[in-house]
Amino acid sequence: MSIKAEEISALIKQQLENYQAELNVEETGTVTYVGDGIARAHGLNNALSGELLEFSNGVFGMVQNLESNDVGIVIMGNYDGIHEGDVVKRTGRIMEVPVGDALIGRVVNPLGEPLDGKGAIQTTKTRPVENKAPGVMQRKSVEQPLQTGIKAIDALVPIGRGQRELIIGDRKTGKTTIAIDTILNQKDQDMICIYVAIGQKESTVRTQVETLRRYGAMDYTIVVSAGPSEPAPMLYLAPYAGAAMGEEFMYNGKHVLIVYDDLSKQADAYRELSLILRRPPGREAYPGDIFYTHSRLLERAAKLSDDLGGGSMTALPFVETKAGDVSAYIPTNVISITDGQVFLDGDYFNSGTRPAIDAGTSVSRVGGDAQIKAMKKVAGTLRLDLASYRELESFAQFGSDLDKATQAKLARGRRTVEVLKQPLHQPLSVENQVMILYALTHGFLDNVPVDDIQRFQDELFDYIASNNKELTDEIRETKQLPDTDKMDAAIKSFAEHFQPTKEAK
C-alpha cells in the first residue's frame, strides 16, 4: 500500500484549518495565612468583594476584605485541608445556593448541601445569597393575616404576611416553641416555611425536625442548619442562604414564612469574623456595619406588589436577651429594623404563664390591618384590660380592702391570663380563638373557676362543633363575627350545662 504525499499534505492542512487555539487564563493567588475560618491571599489584585474563590483542595471561600497587599477570605467549609502557600483562584462568580421545590422537606447546611442522609438535592436552580431588597414601589402594604395559632399573638400582636416581627426574650423562655407552633399552624394555609437554625445544638435541631415531621409540617418546610461546631462563616451565612431560598418562592407569587433562630448568634459569628479580619471594633466589639448586616437581611422580607405576583416573605427573627435587657446593642438594632416585637418574660414563664408573652412591651406596628374583622372586634379591648390587670395586680398585693369594681377587674384579668395560656404544639384555628375570646370579653367566663378555664374552653369547642358548627364556618368563610344573639345563645346554652370541678377555685 503506497502513501501519497498529496494526501498527507491535504490532511495536515485540514487539521490546521480546524485547529482552534483555546487560551484559558486564570487569575491565581497564594495563601499567606489560614485559621479560624479565615484565609488571607496575596496576588488576587482584581478580586471583587463578595466574589467566590476556589482553593486547591476544592473548598470555596468568599472575598470579605480588600486590602492594599492581600484579600481577606471567609472559608465556606472545612479549612483543615488549606495551608499556607496553597494556590487560590478567582471564579468570577458570587456566592449562590440551590433553590426550588426540591428543597422542601429537606435539612440542609447554608451551602444547600443535604444533612439528612436522603441523597443529593435534585435541582439546577440557584440564587445569589446576597440580593437587593425590593424597593418602595415593588412593595404593597401588609393586609393579609398570618395566623400563628397562638391566641396571645393573634389577638394582641397580630402578624401579617410580609411583616418582620421580632421574637425577643431570655434563653429558655419559649422562643423556639412559638416558631415551631407557628409553622405547624401553616398546614393547608398555602405557605412554605423555612426554619434557619443558627448555632443551635444539633440534638435540638434534630428534636425540632422530628416534631415537624410528626405533625406533617416537613411537607412544606425547609430546615437550614448551621451548628455550633461549624466555622463562623457558616453561621454568618445561614440566614442569607435561607432568605435566598425563600425569595425563589416569593418572586414566583407564593407565600413564605422564614424563622431566624437566632440573630444574636449570627451577630456573634460576624463579630468573630470581623475581629480575625482585623476590622476596627465598635460598641460591644461588634464591627461598625453590624446594623447593616441585619437590616439588609430583614428588608428582604416583604409583601410584593401585584405586578410582581403578590408573593410575600414573612420574617420572624429571634434575639436572645441577657436578664431581660432589651437596651443592649443587638436587641435595640433589630427592634428598630422590624415592624414590632413579641417580648417573652422569664418571670411569666417560670410562674406557668406559657406562652410567656408580655402584652405591655409587645407591639405589632401593622396592628389591626393583619387581623380578620371578627378577631378585631373581640380582641379590641383585650390588650388594655390585660395591661390594667397587671397594674392592679401589683397594687392589690399591698392591701386587702378593694371595692367591687376592682375585684371584678382582677377576677376578669385572672381569667384572661388563663385563656391566653396554651399547651405545647396545639395551635388553635382562628374561628376557635374568636369563640373563646368572645366568651371571655362578654362575661361568660366570669363565674367559671380559674382552674376550670382550660376545660371549659376545650368542651366549648367540642360543643360548638357538634351543635353550632355554622357559627365557626361563618367566621372562617366570611372573616366576620356572626350574629351576636346566635353567639350568645350558643355559649349560654353550653355554660348552663358546664359542671365546674368541686376543688376548682
From Swiss-Prot:
It is an enzyme of class 7 (translocase). The record marks 362 as: Required for activity. It comes from the Bacteria. The keyword Iron does not apply. Its EC number is 7.1.2.2. ATP binds at residues 169-176. It is found in: Cell membrane. This is ATP synthase subunit alpha. The lineage of its organism: Bacteria, Bacillati, Bacillota, Bacilli, Lactobacillales.
